[in-house]
């Protein structure tokens, strides 16, 4: 089953996204804890991560390299509204798969849904190529 981890401090946002992805058939885990996020990645229950910008004591720029050290094949989708272009470029270099604006309406949620679908398809292609 396709495991999706949603890591965000915003409870309302986490719940909205979790509901949307559960309805779409994904196995969803939600957390606002860095420790829980790392645990899910190390246990390989999540292949794709929707990452907010801040949680616990770390921000996304500090957490992304840690997540990638745990699983190089992990697809990370950064969900942030107020991130500068320079920071996005840096985070892309760190290994994010996609950057999406925080959803405010149905169109925005559809964009994130498509990004997650694309991330899973990309992972399947990479796994097939490795065989």
Q: Predicted regions: what is each one?
A:
Residues 11-29:
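Two-component/phosphorelay signaling modules centered on CheY-like receiver
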Residues 62, 82-101, 110:
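Alpha4 helix (beta4-alpha4-beta5 surface) of REC/receiver domains from two-component response regulators
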Residues 111, 118-131:
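CheY-like receiver
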Residues 7-8:
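Conserved acidic carboxylate
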Residues 30-48, 52-55:
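Acidic, metal-coordinating helix/loop segments flanking the phosphotransfer/catalytic sites
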Residues 47-67, 83-87:
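Conserved phosphotransfer microenvironments
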Residues 42-44, 66-73, 94:
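Conserved phosphotransfer cores of two-component systems
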